Amino acid sequence: MLQGRSRYLVSTFALLLIGCEKIPEYQVPITLEPQYTFVAPQHIPELDRHGYLLFNTTAFSQKPLHKIYDEYRFHYAHFKCPMNDKFEVSGSIAADELEDNPIIYENHHFKYDVLFTICPENDASKLECIYDFKQLKALPKALSCRVIFGRMFGRSAVISENIKMDISQLEHAKVYEPPQLKENQ
């Protein structure tokens, strides 16, 4: 009985140490590639009413964000842009999952995929998200965004702030075509 309690206390203490670990303050300059693609509404029964628009773009960083993410054992990476009192741009940022390493361009920038929706703040249901290109006309054209890394039960860290995004281009977004996997020869 005592042995079980001591194991529980040791594991709880270890979790608390991980949760209290100091996360360095980063300010990584990130630029967004000015091209967006539209992903058609998903086939989810609850969203059959109208679906929602899911956009993707590309972010470039001189520092390897994926290494910061792994080194400090973050659980999530958010891409957020407060918009107005009604909506916010919210999504995720990740390295290209089809590659072993992120793509490095000749100017030595790491390339990351950014997926995002435009929804009411903190709306996980996606039921009231922007679903029609006409709705974009009522939104501000330029946003200031940030990338946040965080842990489920711990601190989060803002990795980059004041990333400029021009959403006026979303009206001209192309339909997303998933990349074709190459067959091994």
Question: What are the residue ranges of the model-derived segments?
Answer:
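Short, solvent-exposed, Trp/other aromatic-anchored flexible loops in extracytoplasmic proteins
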Residues: 88-155
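Hydrophobic helical h-region of N-terminal Sec-dependent signal peptides
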Residues: 11-14
